[in-house]
């Protein structure tokens, strides 16, 4: 293990140790450690942390980035190295060999086109392919671990945790593996939770129950208060009444009329056209993500007479700001979007049906259980749902339910990782 002194423990300039006098150099090293211990009580050594993610859907990279940002701001004693699993496994990507597209690109294309009917069967097929190439995955990962020599591996990806765990036990026995679920619950088998020695960080009671039900000890199943959100959500200054009204006017919206935020992830979704058609008398902020074709179609459609204005946006990093200007959320039951909306106190309207990704179906159950919104069979019912949600008593109840959710997972997880690394009690 390459041991360094953490930056925030550097009380003596290390350049002073570049002296020709070896004895003086040794005395300065001793002085450095004595001073650090006297001031901090301990020396924190920087440990190499491999943060495993990929770009299927975008939420995994976003969670990894948010976690890294917070740990670096807090000067946690980790040398954080993001690792894109797709890039490591590119040489054996059977989907790329057959179609010219990476596995993550196939997934993103499905989301963009709405080709999600039958996705449970597709996932079963994907698991068969993953198992078929399991040994090769393990060899590639094992070589990577031997080269980079991590002190802690943190996985933010599903499907591949068995290969990650097996390869790590071979290359670096005793190195902890922590899987952070970026879904509200697991979708067994072989999605997030595997039967192998490791830690899990779960953002819901349901996920904790699933991990414990798989035989994992209580001290290996750690509870965070929700999904990982960007720290920007916590940094947004509240808007005053006049400030919020002015910001709405700048988007061409009426400050005195409710606004719905329509968001279907980074790729958008064609169903947004249908939602906009069915809500001609509702003000909407429509976020299209990277889907330029969808944006063009929405802009063309909204040039037709409407009884209420809309604002159309492409890919943006200003989701927290747009959520501040909205009163409710409409979208798919993705764990990230739901969690962001609830954090911003927006009641949600989501759908759940045969087209819903299987790993996202429990999220609709969670919405109902927590009382934070309305779940539809399909968005043909969206007009009635918006009318129901905006009834004063109903809206107040949903808002109160969102306020009961106190999600600070992105700040809790670094402490949990540090305790795992230190071998201290994390239960």
Annotate the PLM regions.
Residues 66-144:
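Conserved N-terminal ligand/cofactor-binding loop architecture of enzyme catalytic domains
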Residues 243-325:
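Donor-nucleotide binding loops and adjacent catalytic segments primarily
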Residues 394-408:
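A short, well-ordered alpha-helix in the C-terminal region of glycosyltransferases
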Residues 407-427:
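C-terminal alpha-helical cap of glycosyltransferases
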Residues 329-331, 347-357:
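Short hydrophobic beta-strand element within catalytic cores of glycosyltransferases
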Residues 113-215, 220:
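Active-site and donor-binding regions of nucleotide-sugar-utilizing enzymes
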Residues 324-337:
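Acidic donor-binding loop of glycosyltransferase active sites
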Residues 198-264:
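A nucleotide-sugar donor-handling region in carbohydrate enzymes
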């Amino acid at each position: 293990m390459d041991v360094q002194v953490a930056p925030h423990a550097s009380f003596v300039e290390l350049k002073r140790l570049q002296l020709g006098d070896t004895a003086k150099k040794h005395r300065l090293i001793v002085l450095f450690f004595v001073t650090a211990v006297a001031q901090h009580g301990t020396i924190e050594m920087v440990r190499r942390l491999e943060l495993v993610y990929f770009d299927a859907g975008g939420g995994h990279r976003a969670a990894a980035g948010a976690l890294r940002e917070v740990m670096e701001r807090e000067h946690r004693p980790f040398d954080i190295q993001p690792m894109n699993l797709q890039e490591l496994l590119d040489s054996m990507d059977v989907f790329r060999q057959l179609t010219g597209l990476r596995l993550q690109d196939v997934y993103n294309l499905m989301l963009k086109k709405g080709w999600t009917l039958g996705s449970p069967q597709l996932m079963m097929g994907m698991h068969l392919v993953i198992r078929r190439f399991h040994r090769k995955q393990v060899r590639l990962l094992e070589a990577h671990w031997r080269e980079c020599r991590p002190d802690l591996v943190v996985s933010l990806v599903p499907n591949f945790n068995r290969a990650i765990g097996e390869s790590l036990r071979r290359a670096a026995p005793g190195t902890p593996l922590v899987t952070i679920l970026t879904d509200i619950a697991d979708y067994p088998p072989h999605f997030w939770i595997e039967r192998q020695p490791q830690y899990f960080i779960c953002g819901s009671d349901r996920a904790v129950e699933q991990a414990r039900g798989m035989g994992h000890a209580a001290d290996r199943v750690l509870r965070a208060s929700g999904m990982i959100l960007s720290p920007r959500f916590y940094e947004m200054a509240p808007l005053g009444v006049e400030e919020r009204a002015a910001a709405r006017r700048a988007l061409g919206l009426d400050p005195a009329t409710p606004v719905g935020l329509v968001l279907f992830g980074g790729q958008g979704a064609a169903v947004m056209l249908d939602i906009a058609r069915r809500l001609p008398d509702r003000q909407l902020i429509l976020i299209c993500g990277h889907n330029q074709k969808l944006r063009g179609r929405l802009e063309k459609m909204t040039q037709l007479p409407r009884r209420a204005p809309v604002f159309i946006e492409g890919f943006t990093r200003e989701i927290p700001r747009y959520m501040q200007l909205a009163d409710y959320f409409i979208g798919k039951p993705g764990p990230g979007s739901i969690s962001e909306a609830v954090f911003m106190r927006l009641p949600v309207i989501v759908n759940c049906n045969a087209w819903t990704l299987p790993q996202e179906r429990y999220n609709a159950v969670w919405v109902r259980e927590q009382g934070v919104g309305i779940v539809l069979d399909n968005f043909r019912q969206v007009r009635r749902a918006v009318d129901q949600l905006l009834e004063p008593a109903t809206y107040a109840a949903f808002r109160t339910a969102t306020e009961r959710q106190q999600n600070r997972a992105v700040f809790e997880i670094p402490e949990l990782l540090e305790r795992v690394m230190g071998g201290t009690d994390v239960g």
